[in-house]
Amino acid sequence: MNLEEGSKLLNSDKNFLYDRNESELRPKFLRDFAGQSHIKENLSVFIKASRDRNEALDHVFLSGPPGLGKTTLASIIAVEMNTTIKVTSAPALDKPKDIVGILTTLDDKSILFIDEMHRLKPVIEEMLYIAMEDYKIDWIIGQGPAARTVRMSIPKFTLIGATTKPGKVASPLYARFGIVSRFELYSEDELVKIIQRNSIILNVKFEDKAAWLLAKSSRGTPRVANRLLRRMRDFAQVGGYDLITENIVSDGLEMLKIDHEGLDEQDRNILRSLILKFKGGPVGVETLAISVGETADSLEDFYEPYLILKGLIERTSRGRKATDFAYCHLNLNKNNHNDLGSEQDGYQGILF
């Protein structure tokens, strides 16, 4: 990698050389949370109203692709409500006693955050129905003929549920959430703000053009932007520079095999498979996922939203289909699906 651009040697302060904890990059307050303005504006009203009434915030349902800040926002809500938060995920709630153990130890007006809500077991969902609506839980004491159900009161709490698959959450459970918000992919402007903010936290100097290039390659996702920011810091550090320039980012992305549209090698594998193995589609998501060594869930949750956003693939009633832009991006002839050679010859042109 050519790191000709840059200025001074890195800061010798040992704090620069050791990675900060990931949580330090997460905003602590709603005012610091970049993007998702429609969600923030509504939440600020709901939080203020709940605090003024000295009540628990209504239950909150957060959905959207991974890496957009659902968990971060849950923590921010707890801070803004001046309360505690307990964090778990649906797969960890295996038996009724698991959810009962959590609900009975909550404080009044505290928050329970459950990630991957679409993976809750039916028996856990049924217990949450009563807990969310009446703030009570039914618990069976004893066994056999002597068994009896006892209804216990629990503190008035706020359940924040997050999922990447809102359509798979049971309707009765979904209906009990009073605040429903969907996260959208971030704009480049919003990602630039996140990169600039976090570069200060990581003690990294960034050129404006470098931040824009990094934002453009971050798939509309803060988690990806933060990961790339750390890698650019590594490249600059090893190269002996404390100013990350556009050329450094460009070279770094090329080393990571991320192209000018933000696509990585697996993104291109998906497009190549769709075009070269299935003649551009349409093809079912399960078949396409198997062809690239992914699960259907990971293909739908992580890769597809961005590929659709960039206009590279489209969903049809018969399956996934490559667009004309996908052929152009891979430098493939749409009339010759076996034209793999031209794609390889044009690979460097695809990157930068």
From Swiss-Prot:
Keywords: ATP-binding, Cytoplasm, DNA damage, DNA recombination, DNA repair, DNA-binding, Hydrolase, Nucleotide-binding
Entry EC no(s): 3.6.4.-
Keyword Aminoacyl-tRNA synthetase carried by entry: no
Catalytic activity: ATP + H2O = ADP + phosphate + H(+)
GO cellular component, one term: Holliday junction resolvase complex
Record-linked Gene3D superfamilies: 1.10.8.60, P-loop containing nucleotide triphosphate hydrolases, Winged helix-like DNA-binding domain superfamily/Winged helix DNA-binding domain
InterPro entries: AAA+_ATPase, AAA_lid_4, DNA_helicase_Holl-junc_RuvB, P-loop_NTPase, RuvB-like_N, RuvB_C, WH-like_DNA-bd_sf, WH_DNA-bd_sf
Protein name listed in UniProt: Holliday junction branch migration complex subunit RuvB
Organism: Borrelia hermsii (strain HS1 / DAH)
Organismal lineage: Bacteria, Pseudomonadati, Spirochaetota, Spirochaetia, Spirochaetales
